Regions:
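Glycine-/small-residue-enriched transmembrane alpha-helix faces in small-molecule transporters
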Residues: 1-46, 90, 149-176, 197, ...
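C-terminal-most transmembrane helix of multi-pass membrane proteins
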Residues: 2-4, 46, 142-145, 216-218, ...
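Specific transmembrane alpha-helical segments of multi-pass solute transporters/efflux pumps
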Residues: 21, 25-29, 54-104, 140, ...
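Membrane-interface helix-cap regions at the ends of transmembrane helices
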Residues: 24-31, 35, 48-66, 90, ...
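Transmembrane alpha-helices of multi-pass small-molecule transport proteins
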Residues: 34-83, 108-110, 114, 165-173, ...
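Helix-helix packing/entry segments at the starts of transmembrane helices
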Residues: 43-44, 99-106, 173-196, 224-264
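Transmembrane alpha-helical segments that form core, pore/gating elements
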Residues: 53, 111-113, 117, 131, ...
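Hydrophobic transmembrane alpha-helices of multi-pass small-molecule transport proteins
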Residues: 53, 74, 114, 123-145, ...
Length: 338
């Protein structure tokens, strides 16, 4: 594998690892949620993640992030690692799983809007179309998983919506920090900030941990080490190499994977409409991450100045003519995107 293909494959692999582990987090949260309250679970998860990330930072001798990165680290740490974790755990106790999945999946749409407004992210038609298809799939998944018995409270819906807003704000604020600090630094110190925000729940964590079954505690540790420490680092690595909008659209694969993991791990057989929604989610991600091909128009007698081939500008990879005869080859350069 050459250097250029490796630079393209690694961010894609990082994004895949992220969505797989984040999907597994929903299963683990359900397993640990019976023994731990929302705040205690969030604090335990952040502490486990901070220990794992801190050890990795020491091994790699990463050091402190540059001053320019701290604003983004602090904001994303408070919003995403702190506030989001608590309100999501709390909201999932107030509404059924389908309603929670439906409301939280407003997040990627908010990321696209905030990314375009605050970061100047481009909004190509393929990205918009893919997000529309994925959101439709998330709606189908949410409605098919909803209990329909009126068990979803207004408070629960508001909490899940706040989680989506915090998620979007955390992603958009994290992106600039990755311009001056490494993915590991941004994730480690963001996780530490989140742990500090959750410290008011320390008393609950100590009390509940003393009587919680070992399996629930192991689920909490798993949440900290894998969906937090590892997945947030691979997320930051991929985010540093593409736009916030594009990465946000990628997370629409999570509902489909949650359905699959619930089927395999919890023996919850999905309904036909749930499977259809999952397929739509994945199809939308594929569309949003696809790129249009460049078209190179060669005109014999009507060649450009100095006998160069005429290149028709279109959206997609950049093409550059190579000096040489009129019929010479064209080298295609693709931007390093996930």
């Amino acid at each position: 594998m050459n250097v250029s293909s490796s630079r393209s494959v690694l961010p894609t692999a990082a994004a895949v690892v992220t969505v797989l582990l984040w999907a597994s987090a929903f299963v683990a949260i359900r397993a640990a949620g019976d023994a731990y309250s929302p705040g205690a679970l969030a604090l335990g998860r952040m502490l486990a993640g901070s220990v794992a990330l801190g050890a990795l930072c020491l091994l790699r001798r990463e050091g402190w992030p540059p001053r320019a990165a701290w604003r983004g680290i602090l904001i994303s740490g408070v919003l995403w690692f702190g506030f989001y974790m608590v309100v999501l755990n709390w909201g999932e106790r107030q509404v059924d799983a389908g309603t929670a999945a439906l409301v939280v999946n407003v997040g990627p749409l908010l990321i696209a809007l905030l990314g375009a407004r605050l970061l100047g992210d481009p909004m190509p038609p393929r990205l918009l179309a893919g997000m529309a298809v994925s959101f439709a799939g998330a709606v189908v998944v949410g409605l098919s998983m909803s209990s329909g018995g009126g068990g979803s409270s207004v408070l629960g819906v508001v909490l899940c919506l706040l989680a989506a807003v915090a998620y979007a704000g955390g992603v958009v604020s994290q992106k600039p920090a990755l311009g001056s600090a490494s993915a590991l630094q941004v994730t480690t110190f963001g996780c530490l900030v989140g742990a500090v925000c959750c410290l008011p729940f320390a008393g609950q964590l100590v009390t509940e941990a003393s009587r919680a079954p070992l399996t629930a505690t192991l689920d909490m540790v798993y949440l900290g080490v894998f969906p937090t420490a590892l997945a947030f680092t691979t997320w930051a690595y991929a985010l540093a190499r593409t736009t916030a909008s594009r990465m946000g659209a990628t997370t629409y694969a999570v509902p489909a994977l949650v359905v699959l993991l619930s089927w395999l791990v919890l023996d919850e057989v999905p309904r036909p409409f749930t499977l259809v929604g999952g397929v739509l989610c994945l199809a939308g991600v594929a569309v949003s991450r696809s790129r249009a091909r460049a078209r190179v128009v060669r005109v014999g007698a009507a060649a450009g100045p100095e006998g160069e081939p005429v290149v028709e500008p279109v959206a997609g990879p950049v093409t550059e003519p190579v000096a040489g005869p009129v019929a010479g080859p064209v080298v295609e350069r693709r931007p390093e995107e996930v």
